[in-house]
């Protein structure tokens, strides 16, 4: 069979690279896996940011897709801070620098290990831009798989915006209404508990969803995938298809 010449094969073929193969085998990789394209799965999973909780399970489907496509997945993590949790206090000073840290991490890992392609798992404000910056630096085949938006909350009566649906952005507006005595504390608490009823990026026209749609328009995601809600099963199949496509 024909052996594909890749960046990773430059450090995996020949007796002079036995030490590298031994290290991968220590990770649990089989000999045959080391002759395939080595695809990075860049995972920003955490239980801090609701837009990133999904990646614990989604990354598994991505790895399965890479294997089905004839590649070998190599997963590593990057940070993913939540702008919403950091907002309104000193923590916000740390958010913008994380974009650079993410880009630096991707560049360092992809170049240090001579990886052949990237699957980027990210959803939120600084994470997608940081990932795209890192991908552009290394100039490798890249597909972004975002986590998708949260489902909206439902507020059948008393919605100050009208209509039936609400999202996380209504909470700050409601805080002002509470201070003015326009809504009760009970109503305010209800909004807090129901405005964001699932994991996913905040379901509003913010940076997270905007960057996801932009990445799709740029051709860095599979078509029609940016706005699939995080809790839909289709999200998992998108991960599999993206992993298979990158190879």
Task: Show which residues each predicted segment covers.
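Flexible, glycine/charged-enriched surface loops at secondary-structure junctions
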Residues: 6-10, 31-34, 70-78, 183-191, ...
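Long, structured ligand/cofactor-binding scaffold of large enzymes
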Residues: 32-146
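Residue-level signal for pocket-adjacent positions within structured domains
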Residues: 18-24, 43, 178, 196-200
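Active-site cavity-forming subdomains of large catalytic enzyme subunits
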Residues: 95-247
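Short amphipathic alpha-helical segments with coiled-coil-like heptad repeat character
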Residues: 1, 50-52, 222-225
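A short N-terminal beta->alpha junction/helix N-cap motif
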Residues: 7, 11, 29, 46-54, ...
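N-terminal amphipathic/basic leader segments beginning at the initiator methionine
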Residues: 3-33, 60, 68
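Ligand-binding pocket scaffold of soluble enzyme catalytic domains
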Residues: 3, 63-69, 158, 165-170
